[in-house]
Amino acid sequence: MRSELFAYDRFYKQNFGTVIGVDEAGRGCLAGPVVAAAVILEVQLDVFDSKQLTAQKREELFLQIMNSAEVGIGIATPEEIDLYNIFNATKIAMNRALASLNKKDAYVLVDGKSLNLSQQGVCIVKGDEKSASIAAASIVAKVLRDRIMVAHDRIYPCYGFSKHKGYGTVHHLNAIREFGPTVFHRLSFSPVLSNLSVKKVHDLFSENINCERAKVILRKLSSS
């Protein structure tokens, strides 16, 4: 039991009442969405930063959290990441997670810094190592995002999404170079954009070439 994480949350609960932990998964990836979770955790579980847990342990804790806590989920798509940038898309996902939880008077503990969300709270650097609620949110967000990436591995089998989950591994970068990016990739990210051309953008979007996302990518290509 990581009691120090619950003691950290207890301080905020004593001062502000209900506390929501918020975290995201997938911010640094080259493909797929950003997934955020908002968690109200009232029972003590053996939670910790999802990055320091095995996949099996994350799955076990995910089920425990979903069965014993109040959970909200928010997703920002690759299209939204390209349109609004990764920082703003992360805020969109987190605000959606909070909105789905619908606890407007609760106090938010969010992992990170300088994130102004839709309700009162505080940003905590390395919050997933300090707060039980944030740690629980990190587990939920990570597990759900991993499942999304595994599902898309069946749609785009050349890229190995089930293995690297969209991160910029050597295998993934080689696949992007060999097969070209997909609409599931974050086309505005430099390692992806560098493998695009005007023709490839037209091929990707075909009849939707006049959509805002295509226009953004074409502008980036022309200025690169």
UniProtKB/Swiss-Prot annotation:
Q: What is its main location?
A: cytoplasm
One GO biological process term: DNA replication, removal of RNA primer
> According to its record, what are the GO cellular component terms?
cytoplasm; ribonuclease H2 complex
Q: Signal peptide position in this chain? A: none
What InterPro entries does this protein's entry cite?
A: RNase_HII, RNase_HII/HIII, RNase_HII/HIII_dom, RNaseH-like_sf, RNaseH_sf
Q: Where in the cell is it found?
A: Cytoplasm
Which GO terms label this protein's molecular function in UniProt? manganese ion binding; RNA binding; RNA-DNA hybrid ribonuclease activity
Coiled-coil residue windows: none
- Known catalytic reactions: Endonucleolytic cleavage to 5'-phosphomonoester
Q: Where is the RNase H type-2 domain?
A: 17-201
- Source superkingdom: Bacteria
Q: Which positions in this protein are listed as binding a divalent metal cation?
A: D23, E24, D111
* Swiss-Prot/TrEMBL cofactor(s): Mn(2+); Mg(2+)
Note on how the cofactor is bound: Manganese or magnesium. Binds 1 divalent metal ion per monomer in the absence of substrate. May bind a second metal ion after substrate binding.
Keyword field: Cytoplasm, Endonuclease, Hydrolase, Manganese, Metal-binding, Nuclease
What EC designation does it have? 3.1.26.4
> What does the record give as the function of this protein?
Endonuclease that specifically degrades the RNA of RNA-DNA hybrids.
The record ties this protein, via HAMAP family, to: RNase_HII_B
Per the record, the similarity remark reads: Belongs to the RNase HII family.
In Swiss-Prot or TrEMBL terms, this protein is called: Ribonuclease HII
Species source reads Pseudothermotoga lettingae (strain ATCC BAA-301 / DSM 14385 / NBRC 107922 / TMO)
